[in-house]
Amino acid sequence: MILYYIIVPLAWLVFNIGFRVRCEGRENLKKIGTKGCIIASNHISAIDPVFIVITRFWGQRMMVFAKKELFEINPFLSWFFRCAGAVCVRGTKEEVGAIDDTVKKCKEGGTLLIFPEGTREKENAFLPLKSGLFVVAAAAGVDVVPCRIHYDTPDGRMKPFCRVRVVYGEPMPAARFSMEGRRDLRKLRENKQ
């Protein structure tokens, strides 16, 4: 949607002024080239997707897996999140269709942002990974780029006007995720039909 291509550059301007966003490891994104990929990031704050999208944006729309509750706040926000590339995949009957559509777009060169822990971190501790990352990586056959967001504050939490570092790691081949992902995708299809 055209709205995406207006919002992202404006967000880049506002958030770079307000938060002094720094991107490290951009060369790892360039290794992907025009192929599709999955960016798998930690999740500290509700605003994390914005920082990742503005450091990755090159005129290409990014998809973001988002929890169901975000789409239930009100109809305007639901519409806005969909325009911004959010894909609702949790607890809905359309989950299989949404995943199939996301896989297709990744195969065609699209980028998916996913938070493999499934929720925001508490107290800077890593949480167990959910299966969504493995499912999409296996089905799409695209590389996974690890990403880490750092808020330069004493407690590592997002504060207004703090410095933000978005760090991209070396791409990991999809083959590393394929066995577990295919098993999870099969389970998902069996449960949803």
Tell me the role of every PLM-derived stretch.
Residues V8, I17-L188:
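Soluble catalytic domains of membrane acyltransferases
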Residues Q193:
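A conserved mid-domain beta-alpha-beta active-site/ligand-binding segment of alpha/beta enzyme cores
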